[in-house]
């Protein structure tokens, strides 16, 4: 049995009122959701990459803890300590600053395991986020999953 039903949905786009079909509405919704998902994924990717960058600096500090403490103790100022860490270990300003703000308890063996676990998890998540950005099908799958979640609620 085939049913056709008229649907008139007037809306304003670019200061011009238009009447569109349900197919056009769904298409515009999907296009909008693609933009939202890509923007969200890029944001999450940038956030994760920043965190990985800091964790890599922590790892260098843990691997060279005695020398890091010596550099910090011998420095006359925070800036001197930061510059010396950057020069000695090839760190950038963000990593050096993070190491200087690091509480000593974060350098214990248990914390080292936590940092390595977080680093591994973030690297896996970064790989997944890059895969989403590289595949329109993955973006469409996310839209589908999110719509199914809404339906279940």
Show the residue positions of the predicted features.
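C-terminal interaction appendages of subunits in large macromolecular complexes
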Residues: 1-153
């Amino acid at each position: 049995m085939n049913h056709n039903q008229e649907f008139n949905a007037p809306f304003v786009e670019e200061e011009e009122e238009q009447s569109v079909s349900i197919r056009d509405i769904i298409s515009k919704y999907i296009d909008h959701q693609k933009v939202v998902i890509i923007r969200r994924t890029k944001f999450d990717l940038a956030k994760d990459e920043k965190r990985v960058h800091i964790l890599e600096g922590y790892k260098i500090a843990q691997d060279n803890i005695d020398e890091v403490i010596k550099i910090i103790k011998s420095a006359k100022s925070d800036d001197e300590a930061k510059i010396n860490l950057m020069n000695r270990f090839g760190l950038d300003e963000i990593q050096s600053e993070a190491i200087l703000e690091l509480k000593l308890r974060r350098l214990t063996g248990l914390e080292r395991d936590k940092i390595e676990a977080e680093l591994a998890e973030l690297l896996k998540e970064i790989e997944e986020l890059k895969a989403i950005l590289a595949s329109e099908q993955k973006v469409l799958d996310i839209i589908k999953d999110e719509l199914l979640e809404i339906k279940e609620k």
